[in-house]
């Protein structure tokens, strides 16, 4: 994996959690 992926993946997880909570 590229180092950037390890930074992007956690950010996407946080966004998904926010969407699930708001939903």
Curated annotation (Swiss-Prot):
Residue ranges of the TM segments: none
A GO MF term: toxin activity
GO biological process annotation, one example: defense response to bacterium
Organism: Conus mustelinus
Location of Serine amide modifications: 22
Key words of the record: Amidation, Antibiotic, Antimicrobial, Cytolysis, Hemolysis, Secreted, Toxin
Primary location recorded for the protein, binned into one broad class: secreted
Subcellular location per the Swiss-Prot or TrEMBL entry: Secreted
Name of this chain's protein: Conolysin-Mt1
Domain of life of the source: Eukaryota
Tissues where this protein is expressed: Expressed by the venom duct.
């Amino acid at each position: 994996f590229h180092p950037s992926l390890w930074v992007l993946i956690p950010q996407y997880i946080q966004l998904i959690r926010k969407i699930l909570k708001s939903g």
